[in-house]
Regions:
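Conserved ABC transporter NBD signature motif
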Residues: 64-72
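Catalytic Walker B motif of ABC-type/P-loop ATPase nucleotide-binding domains
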Residues: 167-170
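A short, proline-enriched helix->beta-strand linker immediately N-terminal to the Walker B motif
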Residues: 161-165
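Conserved ABC ATPase "signature" region
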Residues: 71-72, 113, 120-137
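The feature captures the beta-strand-to-loop junction immediately N-terminal to the Walker
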Residues: 41-43
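Helix-to-loop junction immediately C-terminal to a conserved catalytic motif
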Residues: 56
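Short coil-to-helix segment of the ABC ATPase nucleotide-binding domain corresponding to the Q-loop/switch region
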Residues: 102-111
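Conserved ABC ATPase signature
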Residues: 142-152
């Protein structure tokens, strides 16, 4: 029997406000196999975002078991959980979450920097991803120079940088116009066809209809889990996104990571000269 990629058993997540406890998730049991395309749908406050955060190792469950490819996450410390998140997951957010002072290339490279992948391989991988997503002419553009659809394609490339075995897409078309939203969904369908596990988190039935399995969440509980018949779109051979990065050893030591962080910080300072000057004056003058 094939081992599930993601397996949640009896997952509960509670939050405390003052002397009151709020249950965001209640005894969730869910299995997602490798290569599935799943939509988690629910209204605002349904618990779908909390479920996504636990699936993506962005949060801990209060109770229950969560296994990723058989590995129990319950007792992992923050560092171990971050490494698991880095190795398995790529994230696509509604508001893109790109660093405004960095180019498209540098934004895409960020996950690989934290993974310790050498610069030449990072650069080649980022260029390849952006080119396949139609952004080869925008490598040096900052987010403010890109349209919403282009920014979301940069975030997709970033999600794939370390392989993105599981793509977690939180309202991926929510901030886009109709045409850009369709293009983003077409890319996600292609990634699914290439073997990625794709999990959509949405309130929109039209977005959920792209998945082969739809899970409805309400008041922290799973109301239904059903298969869905859908039509799929394909990218042309020229547009297909490379599914996995080339095999590499993670050779960059902590000194190299410090150098990269320093370079990023320097770019941020140069990009905001006036703010930097005023800050320095405030320090000097007191």
């Amino acid at each position: 029997m094939t081992q599930p990629l993601l397996q949640l058993t009896g997952i509960t997540r509670s939050f405390t406000a003052g002397d009151r406890e709020f249950l965001a998730l209640k005894n969730i049991n869910l299995t997602i196999n490798a290569g599935e395309m799943v939509a988690i749908i629910g209204a605002s406050g349904s618990g779908k975002s909390t479920l996504m955060n636990i699936l993506g190792c962005l949060d801990y469950a209060t109770a229950g078991s969560y296994r990723i490819n058989g590995q129990e996450t319950r007792d992992l410390d923050d560092q171990a959980l971050a490494e698991l998140r880095r190795d398995y997951f790529g994230f696509i957010f509604q508001r893109y979450h790109l660093l405004p002072h960095l180019s498209a290339m540098h934004n895409v490279e960020m996950p690989a920097i934290y993974a310790g992948i050498p610069a030449p391989q990072r650069h080649a991988r980022a260029r390849e991803l952006l080119a396949r997503l139609g952004l080869d002419g925008h490598l040096t553009h900052r987010p403010s120079q890109l349209s919403g659809g282009q920014q979301q394609r940069v975030s997709i490339a970033r999600a794939l940088m370390n392989g993105g075995e599981v793509i977690l897409a939180d309202e991926p078309t929510g901030a886009l116009d109709t045409a850009s939203g369709k293009e983003v969904m077409r890319i996600l369908l292609e990634l699914h066809a290439a073997g990625h596990t794709v999990i959509l988190v949405t309130h929109d039935p039209k977005v959920a209809a792209n998945a082969e399995r739809i899970i409805e969440v309400s008041d922290g509980e799973i109301l239904s889990d059903r298969r869905n018949q859908r039509d799929t779109g394909q990218l042309s051979d020229e547009e297909q996104v490379p599914a996995k990065p080339p095999a590499t050893r993670r050779l960059v030591a902590s000194l190299g990571l410090f150098k990269e962080a320093f370079n990023m910080a320097w770019v941020a300072l140069i990009s905001h000269r006036m703010r930097t000057l005023l800050t320095m004056l405030g320090i000097v003058i007191g």
